[in-house]
A protein has these predicted regions:
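Post-transcriptional modification and biogenesis factors for structured RNAs
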Residues: 1-204
Length: 204
């Protein structure tokens, strides 16, 4: 046990242990060219809330993000494993190696409604740029598209809202399937997360 854990209170240790036990290895979020760092931070906070440990941030058209909006995130970024890529092929090669399928948000005729998708399968969920959505290039790499059912006039949601709706549907399905009652992370990755969290144990 390193010195950071020795300095940790029992209550803090119990909390981190409990949270880590709920982290899901078979669900991730991919953000393609999302411009506003506050949107990214809001997505990170939702990822943390539902037990998604990893998030992939792909920047092919905008500068690499150096930091995320602290106001929205409540420092959620430091509790997640954040992968940043500037090359789409490299990003999705890594994702395909680790996840069974890739689904993108897209308002198209071939898209399936969110509530008809089995989100208990290992899945990477892709959300696109605030203005143009997921690019044709990335949709070509995906295994399918989905949409969030709506009955209003405006047929789009803010990226962080769309992600929250989707992740909480995944949470609902995975909780019913008992996924949060099992240890999901492999031992090496789990240890890496522990090591990172031990440095960040001073605050939420």
């Amino acid at each position: 046990m390193n010195r950071y854990f020795r300095d940790m209170t029992p209550a803090r240790h119990e909390k981190l242990t409990r949270v880590l036990a709920k982290r899901q290895a078979d669900l991730t979020v991919v953000l393609e060219n999302v411009f506003d760092p506050h949107n990214i931070s809001a997505v990170m906070r939702t990822c943390d809330a539902v037990g998604v440990q990893e998030i992939f941030i792909l920047n092919t058209k905008i500068p690499r993000h150096k930091k995320f909006g602290a106001r929205s995130s409540s420092s959620a970024a430091k509790w997640l494993t954040v992968h940043q890529f500037e090359d789409a092929e490299a990003c999705f090669s890594e994702i395909k190696r680790r996840y069974e399928r890739i689904l993108t948000t897209h308002l198209g005729e071939s898209s399936v409604g969110l509530y008809k998708i089995d989100l208990t399968r290992p899945t990477a969920l892709v959300f696109g740029n605030e203005h143009s959505g997921v690019s044709d290039e990335i949709r070509a790499l995906a295994d399918g598209n989905f949409l969030i059912p709506q009955v209003g006039i405006i047929q789009s949601l803010n990226i962080s809202v769309a992600c929250a709706v989707t992740l909480y549907e995944a949470f609902r399905q995975k909780e019913q399937a008992g996924h949060y009652d099992r240890q999901d992370l492999d031992s090496a990755f789990k240890q890496n997360v522990w090591n990172t969290w031990s440095v960040n144990n001073d605050s939420d």
